[in-house]
């Protein structure tokens, strides 16, 4: 139980381990549980940051953007740093003032093509017309957030065809996050070669490699 639950329930865990009459032992065990639980949670946070800010995601996002020059594109990152790192188009995040954010959205709404890079601020509520491509670089296990992000792109507008790219680092916990957040969704899994085919208008080869459950890895 040395983890998030261990941290929350560390007093109860201490009581299971220690003799009720030994105040000194109880204090030492409590401190030890707190130390290890905190270290575990910091490691989990570092793992998530490593996955969310992986440079390969930036590389693939830029490739998609460059291969869709006539599209209106939205990208979703899990943090401002990642959104700013894409380096193509405008950035819309919670760092902006309300006035600047409103102007950014109005200008983008009036464009036929372009890129807007966002994080949580555009998950819901914003009305953006004409989107045809979504690139999701940062994800978690939330099915609600996944549906909201897709909803930004899949809005019926004439005969519009929308593309949604979820960039997932294989053999990491992110594959499990993706599976949990897309339980009721239809999707195809492709590798980078398959992505190149899609971007060139070709039918991608099925990704047949078994996705392993490496929950203990980054």
Indicate residue ranges for each PLM-predicted region.
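Generic hydrophobic alpha-helical segments
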Residues: 60-65, 104-108, 150
């Amino acid at each position: 139980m040395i983890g998030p639950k261990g941290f929350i329930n560390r007093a109860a865990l201490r009581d299971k381990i220690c003799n009720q009459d030994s105040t000194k032992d109880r204090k030492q065990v409590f401190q030890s549980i707190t130390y290890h639980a905190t270290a575990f949670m910091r490691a989990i946070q570092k793992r998530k940051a490593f996955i969310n800010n992986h440079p390969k995601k930036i590389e693939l996002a830029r490739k998609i953007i460059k291969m869709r020059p006539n599209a209106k594109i939205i990208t979703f990152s899990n943090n401002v740093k990642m959104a700013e790192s894409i380096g193509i188009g405008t950035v819309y995040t919670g760092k902006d003032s309300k006035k600047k954010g409103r102007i950014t959205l109005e200008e983008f709404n009036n464009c036929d093509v372009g890129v807007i890079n966002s994080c949580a601020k555009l998950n819901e509520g914003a009305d953006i017309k004409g989107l045809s491509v979504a690139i999701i670089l940062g994800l978690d296990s939330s099915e609600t957030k996944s549906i909201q992000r897709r909803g930004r792109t899949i809005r019926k507008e004439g005969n519009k065809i929308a593309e949604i790219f979820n960039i997932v680092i294989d053999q990491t916990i992110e594959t499990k996050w993706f599976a949990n957040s897309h339980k009721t969704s239809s999707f195809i899994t492709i590798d980078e070669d398959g992505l190149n085919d899609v971007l060139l208008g070709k039918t991608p080869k099925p990704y047949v490699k078994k996705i392993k459950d490496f929950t203990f890895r980054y």
